[in-house]
């Protein structure tokens, strides 16, 4: 899907045919999305602005450089608390791909990952950098 950066909200979606991983780069002002969940594991980074969302019955506020970690089935919403909105990069990791990757590396059954994220947001700069690098590699088709 191509983006249209002339409007206040925009979204670029790419899907890697080999892995099934989807990469989303998006910008929203005001209300972004209603409560929903995904079958995939989500890992992403806020790139610009403040991103506010409910997840796990808590209100979270992400700022540039923070990594977001959302398990499959975790209901979340989203909005921009500031007029300039927010921009983020997100990878949607299919559970089957995660399971296969863990198995290939001898890390056991992916079911151990159920609810595995200790925090929905983290300030770990190495993790945020790794997510960003993986995002750009997939999103740009490298």
Residue ranges of model-derived segments:
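Amphipathic alpha-helical segments enriched in hydrophobic/aromatic residues interleaved with Lys/Arg
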Residues: 105-142
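N-terminal regulatory/effector-sensing and dimerization cores
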Residues: 3-111, 141
């Amino acid at each position: 899907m191509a983006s249209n950066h002339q409007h206040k909200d925009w979204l670029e979606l790419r899907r890697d045919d080999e892995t099934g991983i989807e990469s989303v780069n998006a910008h929203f002002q005001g209300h972004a999305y209603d409560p929903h969940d995904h079958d995939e594991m989500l890992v992403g980074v806020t790139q610009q602005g403040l991103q506010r969302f409910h997840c796990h019955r808590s209100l979270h506020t992400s700022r540039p450089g923070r990594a977001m970690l959302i398990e499959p089935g975790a209901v979340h919403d989203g909005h921009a608390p500031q007029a300039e909105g927010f921009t983020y990069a997100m990878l949607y990791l299919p559970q089957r791909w995660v399971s296969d990757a863990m198995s290939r590396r001898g890390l056991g059954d992916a079911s151990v990952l159920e609810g595995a994220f200790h925090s929905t947001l983290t300030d770990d700069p190495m993790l945020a950098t790794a997510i960003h690098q993986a995002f750009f590699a997939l999103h740009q088709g490298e």
